[in-house]
Amino acid sequence: MDNTSRSNSKFLPTTIKEMRALGWEQADIILFTGDAYVDHPSFGAAVIGRVLENAGFKVAIVPQPNWRDDLRDFKKLGEPRLFFAVSSGCMDSMVNHYTANIRLRSDDAYTPGGVSGYRPDYAVKVYSNIIKKIYPNIPLVIGGIEASLRRFTHYDYWSNSLKPSILIDSEADILVYGMGEKPIVEIAQRLSRGASIYQLRDIPQIGYVDSNLEKYSKSKNTINLHSYDRSEERRVGKECRSRW
């Protein structure tokens, strides 16, 4: 981290040319979002990007990357020094795409011109899987409303099924839930000081996958929830839909 490296620009860079204009060879953090990049506090990626920038990090944004071509949007800025971050945008991508009657919406309020079709269904999972395939050794942090509300086993209305935690499907290293300004800065600061992504598990307001459950079960503060497998066995998904 270098406090003199802030972009001090009107916008955070979204292309390699804009990074070079700022004198950057590499970004510290690269944010992928399902929304257009609008530098306004109603857009979460812009808020997180500016908060990280204010903490002294070089932050670049890739808005609405194309997941259907040769994936050049996922490669154009190269590897970040610290980590990738992924958000579906201001809305869960399935709510963004479909009505309650599961009809495809004709517009997207978070895309230029209101045009639909510029983000995939289950955007966090799709973006994250692509990033992990291309850059398997770079830490990946997910956040935003889609990640936050899907952090546990959950009923997915659109597929009428139970789904496991989005941490499983996305293969992300860390999930930041809720208002993520404080934890994302701490993650960046500690990684910048040389910590491993696996040494950050004491940070409040995060989720991660761990097969060693014994150390948690001994704590009086631990609340045990049903596993995905147990929930699926009890056919909770079908019960949820029948109520409506």
What are these regions (language model features)?
Residues 44, 63-241:
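Glycine-rich beta-alpha loop elements in corrinoid/cobalamin-binding modules
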Residues 38-39, 185:
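Loop/helix-junction capping segments adjacent to catalytic residues or to phosphate/diphosphate-binding pockets
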Residues 16-37, 120, 124-134:
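A short, flexible N-terminal coil/short beta segment enriched in small residues
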Residues 1-6, 55-58, 109-120:
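Acidic/glycine-enriched edge-of-secondary-structure segments
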Residues 2, 21, 25, 104, ...:
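N-proximal short alpha-helices
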Residues 1-23:
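Short N-terminal or domain-adjacent regulatory/targeting segments
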Residues 27-33, 40-78:
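Nucleic acid-processing catalytic cores of prokaryotic defense/repair systems
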